[in-house]
From Swiss-Prot:
Pathway: Lipid metabolism; phospholipid metabolism. GO terms for biological process: fatty acid biosynthetic process; phospholipid biosynthetic process. This is Phosphate acyltransferase. Pfam families: FA_synthesis. One of its GO terms (cellular component) is cytoplasm. GO terms for molecular function: phosphate:acyl-[acyl carrier protein] acyltransferase activity. Homodimer. Probably interacts with PlsY. Its EC number is 2.3.1.274. It comes from Prochlorococcus marinus (strain SARG / CCMP1375 / SS120). It is found in: Cytoplasm. Transmembrane segments: none annotated. The lineage of its organism: Bacteria, Bacillati, Cyanobacteriota, Cyanophyceae, Synechococcales. It is an enzyme of class 2 (transferase). The gene is plsX.
Amino acid sequence: MDNESRSKAIRPKAIRRLVIWYRRNSAVTTLVDTATNSASAAGNVAGSVVSSAGSVVSSAGSIARSTLQPLVFDPLRRLQAGPNELDRNDIANSKRLWVAVDGMGGDNAPGSILEGCLQAIDRLPLCIKFVGEIEKIHSAADELGISDLLNQLISAGNIELVASGPSIGMDEEATAVRKKRDASINIAMDLVKKGEALSVYSAGNSGALMAAAIFRLGRLAGIDRPAIGALFPTKDPGQPVLVLDVGANMDCKPAYLHQFALLGNIYSRDVLQVQNPRIGLLNIGEEECKGNDLSLRTFELLKEEERLDFVGNCEGRDVLSGDFDVVVCDGFTGNVLLKFLESVGSVLLDVLRAELPRGRRGKVGSAFLRNNLKRIKKRLDHAEHGGALLLGVNGICVIGHGSSKALSVVSALRIAHSAASHGVMDDLAALQPPQP
């Protein structure tokens, strides 16, 4: 058998292997037939330009991947885009909501914050009031090569630069907001207070953000301590769980946790569209008698609260189970839980990469598994849930991680827009304080 005949005999077998691998690992089964035909055609093209069986298989695999990209992976990526992912040209400015952004807050400010804001404008129906030192903002835009886009969006009225002083440093005390009245976080809060923006986002000093929110916006009636609420993924991709507090209050009283539950209940109902949120109390056991004094006393308050669907204690293993819509805890415990879960996505992906087969077959299989791995990362990566809410103040405040980059900024601004567009502040303001 000459080389040409051997090549023709091996080529269909290689294509069949590719198809079997794809059928096992692809999430878009409705496009398998189209992808298979295209891959077969790619193999025929490869066969006409190679002279050995090994090069035929390699070229067929490469062309198959490039063929599947526009037919399968790109449509899947478009299907995965959230309902708020829109074309900027299709959104009228009158339909956009204004969000104030502390452009100087964060380890990567102002560059990464600005980059994320420009991406958010392209994807979400919002406009940005970007607060910061103007010269530094333009310098960062030049370094990133986004000056033309920035100027274009300024001319279109999608973004406005608002001058301020420097930010509150990460190592500064929260009380610095009273001394630095022109700090970027103070100016951003004032925009919300004046009604020029519906929500505010900052990746800067979280203590300073909380202090500025309390001093500038004030607490809601009946709320003693604001709480930071974070959205965690669950087994149900479309229904996260709200956990609060995750860092605002290290030492709590039962009354504080009671208030946290009421705040979380309203947010889950209004913004996450959960008809009757299930409230859980983070504890070391499911039984009513388990836990420390704080847990036992809080359990009694939540059990007697008629405005809540309190379903009992939630163990750590059940936080992501999908059995709870809101989980309440003190800020110390919640922050430990938050930091632990932030590492889960990256660790899991590292394990999966290490377990994938090596060699030529491994490379081909990895190509078809790429989208599956991306979806896993999307659900577990904290950058995809890049903001936490400060609930209990008279305004919508979203806190970003200090190391936030563009993707985290976009995710946080999506949360800010969602909260503002659902009118959650009206229901929070109408919340009656718990009875003593």
